[in-house]
């Protein structure tokens, strides 16, 4: 049975997020569309035969690189040129098929070609369904950091088919679980409770739960809960100036680690480490008790996600953290100040922290505290 969500963007337009079979995609092609560019990753080429049934529409295929290697200016330029060479107009359509990197890149291409061409996202990974494809953020990477170039551009439709997740490997599932767990910490604690209860039933002798053993109905329930969290926050703050930034929980260190390690860490692995780090910072500042920090570590470790950073020196991380978008705005949402901190831009960074489960806020933290929290994550 189809389930539908509506997301209001910065304009009067509404993006529909549909949970239905991918074979229904042609029901949602805008009238007047003459050409469709299918931007796909090699890992999802099995979706392509669906588009061979198109009637009255000319379909083009464009293979893009897998994972973060897709999010480069050179790749975006090649896509723009392909669109131009094949005479795509504003009345035509892009369809992206793939993971989070596919929607980030294709959304950016769609937002900038002819200053805007319609796009439908078909996320084929868990992280795509619960995060990357929803909300209208697009982005490509620079050597100086992740997602430093991008736009806010809402897709026409996001079509999610959970049956496509049955072929995902363990690592891709774990990456998506990290984003689902994040939603549990920042808004919906029932997500954490569901995962903890499931762990009691499926834990192996190593005290771990294989993500591939998650019952399909349970996984779909978690997907809907995470999507609801994201829609709630994006609906009230499409341009990411306040409440939507709570979705960035764990991402300040995560993006820095991804860049500093040349994306050897997956996004989900980095977010997992980043959430534990944010909890460590909040604990160091006396905002949360050790029980909440321990809960972060326990649930993430149980599902096979890392809680300790790789061996990356702090001085190699701080330049990326200072470029975090939250540092560009005066958006503290709490009056909490550490009297020992000197409010200088060069000595502080803004993070999303917790006062409690489902009680996030944004505040400035001194680099002294940030370093101490980072060092505390390594085994003594």
UniProtKB/Swiss-Prot annotation:
Keywords attached to this entry: Amino-acid biosynthesis, Aromatic amino acid biosynthesis, Cobalt, Cytoplasm, Lyase, Metal-binding, NAD, Nucleotide-binding, Zinc
Pfam families xref list: DHQ_synthase, DHQS_C
Location within or outside the cell: Cytoplasm
Cysteine disulfide links: none
Function: Catalyzes the conversion of 3-deoxy-D-arabino-heptulosonate 7-phosphate (DAHP) to dehydroquinate (DHQ).
HAMAP family, sorted: DHQ_synthase (MF_00110)
Name of the protein described by the UniProt record: 3-dehydroquinate synthase
Protein species of origin: Tropheryma whipplei (strain TW08/27) (Whipple's bacillus)
Lineage, opening ranks: Bacteria, Bacillati, Actinomycetota, Actinomycetes, Micrococcales
